[in-house]
């Protein structure tokens, strides 16, 4: 039998540029990344700086449900 993953869960990170109306975007839409996190070590929502190809620059990506 296989073990369960335990405290590791899959999360979705969404670009925060959707809130900024004054920036010029390369494409329209919202870009998302998927990642995993350990629920025991990081119970709060994650916020990372990652590259957004729609904005063509590094932006904050926040964890969504």
From Swiss-Prot:
PROSITE patterns linked: RIBOSOMAL_L33
Keyword Mitochondrion: no
Annotated GO biological process: translation
Sorted UniProt keywords: Chloroplast, Plastid, Ribonucleoprotein, Ribosomal protein
Location(s) in or outside the cell: Plastid, Chloroplast
The keyword Chloroplast belongs to this UniProt entry's keyword annotation: yes
Gene3D superfamilies: Ribosomal protein L33
Cellular component aspect of the GO annotation: chloroplast; ribonucleoprotein complex; ribosome
Domain of life: Eukaryota
Annotated GO MF terms: structural constituent of ribosome
InterPro entries: Ribosomal_bL33, Ribosomal_bL33_CS, Ribosomal_bL33_sf, Ribosomal_zn-bd
Record family assignment: Belongs to the bacterial ribosomal protein bL33 family.
Protein name: Large ribosomal subunit protein bL33c
Native organism: Gracilaria tenuistipitata var. liui (Red alga)
Gene field: rpl33
């Amino acid at each position: 039998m296989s073990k369960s993953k335990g405290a590791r869960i899959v999360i979705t990170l969404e670009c925060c540029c959707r809130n900024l109306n004054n920036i010029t975007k390369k494409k329209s839409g919202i870009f998302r990344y998927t990642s995993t996190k350990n629920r025991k070590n990081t119970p709060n929502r994650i916020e990372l700086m990652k590259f957004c190809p729609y904005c063509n620059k590094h932006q904050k990506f926040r964890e969504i449900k």
